[in-house]
A protein has these predicted regions:
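Anion-binding (especially nucleotide phosphate/pyrophosphate-binding) glycine-rich loop
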Residues: 1-147
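Phosphate/pyrophosphate- and phosphate-bearing ligand-binding catalytic cores of soluble enzymes
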Residues: 4-5, 10-14, 55, 150-306, ...
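Beta-rich strand-turn-strand
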Residues: 105, 305-308
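Phosphate/pyrophosphate-binding loops and the adjoining catalytic core of nucleotide-dependent enzymes
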Residues: 315
Length: 334
């Protein structure tokens, strides 16, 4: 286990904020984590980070930052049709996807190149191109921060919805994910109906590796590489509005894209709303709206978290003014 004081969080946030944690703790097993918690009633306030691809630090963190280095992948169940694989929370998400594809297992390929770690995938319910982590997750193994007890959550207990889970809501900050068990298919099954995957494949017969590479190309074309330009992926969630509000908006803006969701509600791409407000490529100080995807805010170099937040607020205000729609951050602001 590693414990550091006044530790730079630069490698732990893709926005590139050079902030410090008063204490930083990295553990590489459940036993190390529970051992640390047993001896440290002073663990609060605390924040658990993964790859930091969905975090915006606006100041130094005065408490304890925890990071999992729990690695490993273990097959825990298998039939002719599927395989259940239990993965350590500290594994890099895209390494897991690459591994699944190399093994010939179906289900994770549309989630290629999403930054971050496996533990966060189960908290955030990451998603792309018509697939969400919740579609693959069977169990989430956790440790309770207060009691140090282990608890396994079945998929249904995680209350998953679009970019939401019980770990972000009712149980926020209460449980640490240590392992996630995914069920992947052994028989060919692709989701190619979303976005331009089909077009990117160019009529070729889909294969696991082919779909993975198509998704990687699409993402690289639209989303900035955090190593080159600090960012947290989509800064806002796509708003979901009641049908009546959508109808009224569609009358005024007939070309507005939309996706119907449960309960007769409609999801509108926040990127389109922001784009229509004229923000694409605009900046305030060293914080900018990415020129190729308006949903992404970028650090042009040396921006503070507060500067990024100011830009985010200005963007959200103009969307509210023009469309009457509230957009909420997907990124966690600390
Ligand atoms: N659009 C614009 N202008 C823009 C951006 C988008 O007009 O600047 C329009 C597009 O033309 C399209 C629609 O908005 O009609 C949706 O855009 P896109 O397909 O790029 O997807 P998104 O809704 O912007 C979501 C996820 C992404 C995920 C993609 C693909 C959220 C908040 N974001 O983006 O996830 O990769 O779909 O499935 O749901 C992330 O969460 O960090 C992330 C990148």
């Amino acid at each position: 286990m590693k414990i550091y004081k006044d530790y730079s969080l630069l490698p732990y946030n893709t926005f590139g904020m050079d902030v410090k944690a008063a204490r930083f703790v990295e553990y590489d097993s459940v036993e190390e984590l529970t051992g640390f918690l047993a001896g440290h009633e002073d663990v609060f306030p605390c924040l658990h980070v993964g790859g930091g691809s969905n975090l915006l630090f606006t100041a130094d963190y005065a408490g304890t930052v925890l990071h999992s280095a729990i690695k490993g992948r273990e097959i825990v169940g298998e039939t002719e049709d599927w395989v259940d694989i239990r993965v350590g929370a500290g594994e890099v998400w895209d390494d897991f996807v690459a591994y699944a594809v190399a093994c010939g297992w179906y289900g994770a390929e549309n989630l290629s190149l999403i930054p971050g770690e496996v533990g966060a995938s189960a908290v955030q319910n990451i998603g792309a191109y018509g697939v969400e982590a919740k579609d693959l997750i069977r169990f989430v193994d956790t440790v309770c921060l207060e009691t140090g007890c282990r608890r396994r959550f079945a998929n249904e207990e995680c209350c998953y919805s679009y970019r939401e889970s019980v770990f972000k809501k009712e149980l926020k900050g209460k449980y640490i994910v240590t392992h996630v068990t995914f069920r992947l298919g052994k028989r060919p099954a692709f989701r190619l109906d979303y976005g331009n995957i089909q077009a990117e494949l160019g009529g070729a017969e889909p294969t696991l590796e082919g779909v993975r590479q198509a998704v990687i190309r699409i993402r690289r074309a639209k989303l900035p590489d955090p190593k080159l330009l600090g960012n947290g992926g989509s800064f806002f969630m796509n708003p979901v509005v009641p049908a009546e509000q959508f109808e009224a908006l569609a009358q005024r803006f007939p070309d507005m894209p939309c996706y119907p969701v449960a309960g007769g509600r409609v999801k509108i791409p926040a990127g389109w709303l922001i784009d229509r407000c004229g923000w694409k490529g605009k900046s305030i100080g060293r914080a900018a709206v990415y020129e190729r995807q308006a949903l992404v805010l970028v650090n042009l170099g040396g921006a503070s978290g507060k500067e990024i937040l100011q830009l985010a607020q200005a963007v959200a205000h103009s969307v509210k003014d023009k469309f009457g729609v509230t957009i909420a951050p997907e990124v966690n602001i600390i």
